Structure formats: C-alpha cells, structure tokens
Amino acid sequence: MKYLVSLCCALLMLVACSKQPDNNIEAHKAAMKRFETMINTADSNIAKELVANNAPFYTPASPTPLYGGEGYLSVVHWMRQSFPDVQWKLEDMVAEGNVVAVRWTLSGTHEGEFMGMPATGKHCSTSVMNFYYFNDEGKVINDIAAEGMIGILRGIGALEK
C-alpha cells in the first residue's frame, strides 16, 4: 500500500510538472485573424493594438526598415498604389510558442506601376508565407516573409510562366 501511495504521488507530481499547453497560442491565432482585418482595411487602430512600436518591417519600397503599426500599414499602402483592390486571405495558420506561421492568398488587379512594370489591368493571385513573432504582451514584434514576388510578377506578365 505504501508503494501504491508513493507511485500515485509520483504520478501526480509528474502530471503537475509537465509542460502545460501555451494559452498564448490561441490568443496569437486570434490576433492573426484581426491582423487579416487590419491589412485588408488599413485600420490604424487595429495596427496600434496588434503591432509593437519597435517592430521592424521591410519592403522593396523603402531602403530602411519601417517600424510599428504605421510602418506595416505603409507596406499595405505601397501595395495599394499598384493593386488598389489588393486583399489578403488567411488560408492556413500554425502556431507554436510565440510564433505563428500564416499562408496567405494575396490577390488584386494591377492598375498602377509595380516595381517598374507599368499597369497591365491583369488580376493576379499568389500564395505568400509569413512568420509572425509575438512578445509577452501579445503584440507582433517581427514578421519574416517568404516573398511571393515571383507569383505577383508572373501574374502581371512581367515574367513568363
């Protein structure tokens, strides 16, 4: 009986000390759904809520990083200069710890110059992949993108398929 009680205590300690699921994962995934709204509406209030002020973002339109929610939205505005109807659709999302990987479908009509290519009027769509990193306050602090530029350039006819 003494051994049974000891075994039960050991099992309880093992269960209690095992890694608990990260509740932040669900919060980060919910934040990414709001992020989708932010980039499709260019809502600066949502940007302030979701993106840390010191988060760097990179774009071919700027030789230096852009920072914070406004910096991220400047990337959105840059895309809208060429694709006024641009939309991002969240297709897949995987989260672990403080990182969320998202596969987006980016689509829009090429109505303005894009990276030196004059407007073609063509509608294009491509998949892009981003990894978003969150801080302890639940804000995005970094975004690493697997650029879909080849898909965009093929879609507007700048590259052959």
Cite the ranges covered by each PLM segment:
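Positively charged n-region of N-terminal signal peptides that target proteins for export
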Residues: 1-4
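Bacterial N-terminal signal peptides
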Residues: 6-15
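Short, low-complexity N-terminal intrinsically disordered segments enriched in polar/charged residues
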Residues: 17-53, 159-161
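A solvent-exposed, acidic/Ser-Thr-rich amphipathic alpha-helical stretch
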Residues: 27, 44-97
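Hydrophobic pocket/interface hotspot
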Residues: 35, 46-48, 55, 72, ...
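Short beta-strand edge/turn micro-motifs at domain boundaries
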Residues: 101, 125-154
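Exposed beta-sheet edge and beta->alpha loop/turn motif
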Residues: 105-136
